[in-house]
């Protein structure tokens, strides 16, 4: 073989070795996919680099995601950004617009969600809650007197109103006894009074007659009711009773007048008058339209701020509980090596070819240098 043939032959051999070596090295990143054994011993370089280091790769990828990609700081920064808030507001407004078109009642929506008879449940909850609060108030303030419980300003205003109250009582009494019903009632009272007096009453009835006596008593009664001294007398009586009432503790008032039962009875009447049933019979659309301005301008922004604030403050603990590194590791472990190889080769196919060609070029250069040494020495 001549000098030129030797030179070309060694360049070709070197280039082929370099190209094949690099191509084989690239293939050995992924292949073989599993280990092969010969005489009970594992064949070297099986499985390929990535399949063999798969567990370590999955673990490192999980740590990389947690420590460098999905960090609490990065997510918080994204959550509090103006773009995120604007997007969240837009989504919320779209939801409100959608709800405003709904013909479903609140009751129907809750029943679809699994709550049976929501209006009854709401009334029962309110009743139970108010009972608990009232019992708590009774325990807390049962031994305190009314003057300790009622503010001084309120007591003073009530005391100032006593003359007005007594005047109102007397004026209503005058109007009643001037009416036909009042006159009849007064006549009946006089008749009953005389009957209880036996013979003396019969004698009075004999001389005057019931109607005549009622006609004589009524003007005097009205005169008495219109008298300022009567008003003052009634005011003084009311003030004295008010003064005594202020000294009563709630427990004493309960023993004397059954105050707790009266309060609970009043509570039941109020709750019956203000049942939640009409609210639950409203359609969601009606309620949304009625409060649309408050929902979009006040409640939605405030709710989003609270929601984002709550998420941000608890984000770190939530991410720790999620254990993202384990999730990433599990997903990488389950990901087929064949699919991973296909993805990497499809992305870096051109670069891998260039590496193969570079191996051939370097092998050719080495072959040329070797040919020079062979020819010269």
From Swiss-Prot:
It is a multi-pass membrane protein. The chain crosses the membrane at residues 1-21, 357-377. InterPro entries: DUF445, UCP032178. Pfam families: DUF445 (PF04286). GO terms for cellular component: plasma membrane. Its main location: membrane. Keywords: Cell membrane, Membrane, Transmembrane, Transmembrane helix. It is found in: Cell membrane. The keyword Cell membrane applies. PANTHER family: UPF0754 MEMBRANE PROTEIN YHEB. Belongs to the UPF0754 family. This is UPF0754 membrane protein YheB.
């Amino acid at each position: 073989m001549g000098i030129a043939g030797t030179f070309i032959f060694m360049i070709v051999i070197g280039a082929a070795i370099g190209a094949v070596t690099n191509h084989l090295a690239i293939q050995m990143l992924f292949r073989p996919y599993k280990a092969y054994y010969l005489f009970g011993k594992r064949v070297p370089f099986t499985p390929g680099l990535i399949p063999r280091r798969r567990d370590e790769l999955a673990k490192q990828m999980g740590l990389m995601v947690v420590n460098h990609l999905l960090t609490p700081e990065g997510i918080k920064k994204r959550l509090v950004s103006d773009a995120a808030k604007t997007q969240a507001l837009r989504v919320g407004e779209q939801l409100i617009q959608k709800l405003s078109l709904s013909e479903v009642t609140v009751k129907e929506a809750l029943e679809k969600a699994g709550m049976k008879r929501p209006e009854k449940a709401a009334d029962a909850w309110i009743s139970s809650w108010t009972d608990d609060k009232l019992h708590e108030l009774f325990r807390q303030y049962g031994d305190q007197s009314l003057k300790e419980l009622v503010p001084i300003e309120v007591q003073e205003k009530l005391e100032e109103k006593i003359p007005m109250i007594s005047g109102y009582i007397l004026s209503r009494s005058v109007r009643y006894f001037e009416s036909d019903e009042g006159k009849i009632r007064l006549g009946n009272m006089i008749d009953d009074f005389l009957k209880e007096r036996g013979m003396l009453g019969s004698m009075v009835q004999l001389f005057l007659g019931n109607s005549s006596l009622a006609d004589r008593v009524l003007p005097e009664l009205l005169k008495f009711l219109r008298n300022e001294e009567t008003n003052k007398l009634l005011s003084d009586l009311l003030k004295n009773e008010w003064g005594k009432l202020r000294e009563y503790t709630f427990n004493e008032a309960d023993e004397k007048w059954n105050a707790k039962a009266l309060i609970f009875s009043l509570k039941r009447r109020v709750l019956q008058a203000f049942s939640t049933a009409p609210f639950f019979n409203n359609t969601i659309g009606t309620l949304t339209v009625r409060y649309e301005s408050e929902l979009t301008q006040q409640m939605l922004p405030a709710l989003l701020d609270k929601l984002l604030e709550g998420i941000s403050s608890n984000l770190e603990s939530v991410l720790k509980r999620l254990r993202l590194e384990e999730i990433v590791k599990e997903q990488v472990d389950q990901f087929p090596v064949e699919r991973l190889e296909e993805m990497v080769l499809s992305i870096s196919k051109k670069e891998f070819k260039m590496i193969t060609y570079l191996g051939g070029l370097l092998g050719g250069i080495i072959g040329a240098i070797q040919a020079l040494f062979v020819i010269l020495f």
